[in-house]
Swiss-Prot record:
TRAM domain ranges (all copies): 5-64
Stated name of the protein: 23S rRNA (uracil(1939)-C(5))-methyltransferase RlmD
Name of the encoding gene: rlmD
UniProt organism field: Legionella pneumophila (strain Paris)
Single GO biological process annotation from the record: rRNA base methylation
Family assignment from sequence similarity: Belongs to the class I-like SAM-binding methyltransferase superfamily. RNA M5U methyltransferase family. RlmD subfamily.
Length: 444
């Protein structure tokens, strides 16, 4: 029998917000059912309209605030209500941190079935103009005869939010978005550029133009003039990721750089490489991870998901040896390059399938006293399942997804005999619901 789709009640409703969801939406209880409302804060009475009715929950659109929360602030960005780049600008920065810390501890309790012996003070940074990496969509609109440059709309990702500024982006891009739009408006093939990747180092900013067709000579000239006038490195991407090349300056090397001044280390990276988006927070995160490791001169450390050596190289200055393992061969090459340029010799790097600990052990036949894990959002499930084969006394786990951290914590604590000593959040992405966290496990 065909299911009858519930009809939307389009009349406005009033409800009190009782909590926040993991993605920062307000939660109201209407007739005993959870209703998620973007932009609403706990304690507020809001007027809303249903946008989706499901079996277990509903979703609604915020129409007005009847009783505002004392936690509410005026968003700095004029595009905030539509743009999908942020989700928490209406909440004070201090409350954002409290929300993220509470969310982490709740997940560790609910899914990790444990709680840390102590809670780390949150790591924070400047919460404007922090974002050094981003992907901007572009589209030339025939009706308007103008180009849209921006992030996808929050409520309809098929569409682009046309923005003139972005206060979370690197300050140079923040002020130059208008000029980017004007550049594409003047090109002969206005439909050629599908997106623009932004990557900033400490001293340079690179733009990667995804060109769907070969550029005309005139368009190449316009891009060169733009890059020269506004001082950008420009890369073109005519195909897949391996097609990216440095277009301007034509004689320039392809790398940007960032520094960890406390360790006198400079990293070079390609604009396509994975690097942390928030340079200030990254410096604090590396220092906290090393402090939690309590490294000794005799320690041999395993750095899993090591990337270009962001943790490996500074750790190597405090221990006997670091072995870094990474799934991406290009990043392993980059890690070796950075070790060499910084004259760090007590490190080795390997490419391996990090879902197969036995493959890692076959490459690295040594004992490790300590392990650092910095996995992608999917977490480190296979590693923690097989952690016995490594048998470290101490594990520092850097996480970009608190749900998978909680899952892996459950295994480490309740199956493998580790104790969760401490944990806390690191606000890598202010004004978003994204939660970066760090946890320390000690063998029981």
């Amino acid at each position: 029998m065909r299911k009858v789709k519930p009809k939307l009640n389009l009349t406005s409703q009033t409800a009190r917000i009782v909590n926040l969801s993991h993605d920062g939406r307000g939660i109201a209880r209407v007739n005993g059912k959870a209703t998620f409302i973007q932009g609403a804060l706990p304690g507020e009475v809001v007027e809303f309209q249903y946008t989706r009715v499901k079996k277990d929950f509903d979703e609604g659109k915020l129409l007005s605030i009847v009783e505002p929360s004392t936690l509410r602030v005026e968003p700095k960005c004029p595009h905030y209500q539509m743009c999908g780049g942020c989700s928490l600008q209406h909440m004070s920065a201090e409350e954002q941190i409290r929300f993220k810390q509470s969310h982490l501890l709740d997940l560790l309790s609910r899914y990790g079935h444990t709680e840390p012996q102590s809670v780390l003070s949150p790591l924070t940074s400047h919460h404007w103009n922090y974002r050094n990496k981003a992907r901007l969509s572009t589209r030339f609109v025939e009706k308007k005869q103008s180009t849209m440059v921006g992030f996808r709309e929050r409520n309809n990702p098929r569409f682009i939010t046309e923005i003139n500024q972005c206060p979370i982006l690197n300050s140079k891009i923040d002020t130059d978005i208008v000029h980017l739009r004007k550049l594409i408006d003047t090109m002969e093939d206005k439909h050629c550029i599908a997106q623009i990747e932004v990557a900033a180092g400490d001293n340079e900013v690179a733009l990667i133009f995804r060109n769907l067709s070969p550029l005309t000579e005139q368009d190449e000239l316009k891009i060169r003039e733009f890059a020269q006038q506004f001082q950008y490195k420009v890369f073109l991407q005519p195909g897949g990721l391996d097609s990216v090349f440095c277009f301007y300056p034509s004689d320039a090397h392809a790398y940007l750089s960032y520094e960890l001044p406390d360790y006198q280390i400079t990293f070079q990276f390609h604009p396509n490489d994975f690097t942390q988006v928030n340079a200030e927070l990254n410096r604090k995160m590396v220092t906290q991870a090393i402090q939690l490791m309590e490294l000794k001169n005799s320690d041999i450390v395993l750095d899993l998901f090591c990337g270009l050596g962001n943790f490996s190289l500074p750790m190597a200055k405090h221990c006997s040896r670091v072995i870094g393992v990474e799934g991406n061969k290009n990043m392993v090459e980059r890690a070796y390059m950075n070790a060499k340029s910084n004259h760090i010799t007590n490190v080795d790097f390997y490419a391996a399938n990090l879902d197969d600990v036995m493959e890692v052990r076959s490459l690295v036949n040594t004992s490790f006293s300590k392990v650092l894990i910095d996995p992608p959002r999917s977490g480190a499930l296979e590693i923690v399942k097989q952690i016995d084969s490594i048998d470290p006394e101490r594990i520092v786990y850097v996480s970009c997804n608190p749900i998978t951290l909680a899952r892996d914590t459950d295994i480490l604590v309740n199956q493998k005999g580790y104790v969760l000593i401490t944990a806390g959040v690191m606000d890598m992405f202010p004004h978003t619901a994204h939660v970066e966290s760090i946890a320390l496990f000690q063998k029981g």
